[in-house]
A protein has these predicted regions:
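Cyclophilin-like peptidyl-prolyl cis-trans isomerases
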Residues: 1-174
C-alpha cells in the first residue's frame, strides 16, 4: 500500500505520522478495528486494541487541551485537528482517528477502502493523504471476518509489518 501524504493541507498530521513511522512505532502493529464498507483502523502501538498510542512529540496539546508547556507524560501528547483543510473522506484516503473530543488525535489512523466514502466524517477527522497504490488491499482487509472480543476486531490479526517513508520532491510517500 502506497500513500501520498499531503503536508500542505495537514502539516502537523503529516509531521506526526512521519516521525512515528521513522521511529518504527507502526511496525508490527495490528489493524484492531475493521468495518466492511467503511474503514480499517490501526496505529495503536501502545496497546494494540484501540486504547493507546499518542503523538510523536508535543504539538501544544495534552489530552486534547491546548497547553503552553509539554504534558507531564508523553502518553498525553495529542495533536490539534486540521479537519477543515479541504480534504474529504473519499475512498482510498488516510485520516486520523481520535476520540469524540476535538484535538485528541495521536498515533491511530484509518484507511478508507474502495467501497466507502464516509462523508459524515468530513470536518471532524483530519484527512492527511491519499492511497496512490494498493487500495484493493485496504478493501480486502476491510472484508476479513471480525467479531473477536465482541468488537470489530478481526478474528485473526491483520498486521502492518512496516511503514517506510520515501521522500520525494513533491510529497512524503509511505
Amino acid at each position: 500500500i502506497v500513500i501520498g501524504l499531503d503536508a500542505e493541507a495537514a502539516p502537523i498530521h503529516v509531521d506526526n505520522f512521519v516521525k512515528l513511522a521513522e521511529r518504527g512505532e507502526y511496525n508490527n502493529v495490528i489493524f484492531h478495528r475493521v468495518i466492511d464498507n467503511f474503514m480499517i483502523q490501526g496505529g495503536d502501538f501502545q496497546n494494540q486494541d484501540g486504547t493507546g498510542g499518542y503523538a510523536a512529540e508535543f504539538y501544544g496539546y495534552c489530552d486534547g487541551n491546548e497547553q503552553p508547556n509539554p504534558c507531564n507524560y508523553e502518553s498525553q501528547y495529542t495533536i490539534p485537528d486540521e479537519a477543515d483543510n479541504g480534504l474529504v473522506h473519499d475512498s482510498c484516503t488516510i485520516s486520523m482517528a481520535k476520540t469524540n473530543n476535538p484535538n485528541t488525535g495521536g498515533s491511530q489512523f484509518f484507511l478508507i477502502p474502495e467501497d466507502s466514502e464516509p462523508s459524515h466524517l468530513d470536518g471532524v477527522h483530519t484527512v492527511f493523504g491519499e492511497i496512490t497504490s494498493g487500495c484493493s488491499h485496504v478493501t480486502a482487509i476491510s472484508e476479513v471476518p471480525t467479531g473477536a472480543q465482541g468488537q470489530d476486531k478481526p478474528n485473526s490479526d491483520v498486521t502492518l509489518i512496516s511503514v517506510d517513508i520515501i521522500r520525494t520532491a513533491v510529497e512524503d510517500t509511505v
